[in-house]
């Protein structure tokens, strides 16, 4: 996790890397995604956002507790719990999902697709509404999530979108 002042945004930003999650009511949260997925949760009533960044859905190996955030099967429940521990109400949670790029050649394992489908299915099981999904299978992206309005700015190599 890296905290810095972003001169373009004129804001304090916390950058998370694979395996990390962060919850805030003040700081913009950012990450860079390829095949990984970031789940961004919001409780607008409590002005709270959280973001995780996971690499794979699961592992067939034993995972040490400090590595669990790298896997969606752990990362999504951990993010939900972190939101609740910071004052969010489960009934207020809403989600936006990003990432899931497939860089591999045709016919290869589609890690990005598996990651994105897992996020959607898991949030549906938790009954958390998904307000936006950005799973373009061909583009990496950098995302910035804002706590005051749940706006997420996505920067691609060829442009920018707001979700």
Swiss-Prot record:
Keyword entries, A-Z: Chemotaxis, Hydrolase
Ligase in keyword set: no
Gene3D superfamilies to which the protein is assigned, alphabetical: 3.30.1330.200
Query: What's a Pfam family in this record?
Result: CheD
| UniProt-listed Enzyme Commission number(s) | 3.5.1.44
Q: Tell me one GO molecular function of this protein.
A: protein-glutamine glutaminase activity
**Broad class of enzyme this protein falls into:** hydrolase
Q: Which GO terms describe its biological process?
A: chemotaxis
Q: Which domain of life is it from?
A: Bacteria
Catalyses which reaction(s)? L-glutaminyl-[protein] + H2O = L-glutamyl-[protein] + NH4(+)
**InterPro entries from the entry?**
CheD-like_sf, Chemorcpt_Glu_NH3ase_CheD, Cytotoxic_necrot_fac-like_cat
What does this protein's UniProt record list under function?
A: Probably deamidates glutamine residues to glutamate on methyl-accepting chemotaxis receptors (MCPs), playing an important role in chemotaxis.
Read off the HAMAP family from this record. Answer: CheD
Give the record's family classification: Belongs to the CheD family.
Protein name, entry field: Probable chemoreceptor glutamine deamidase CheD
Q: Which gene encodes it?
A: cheD
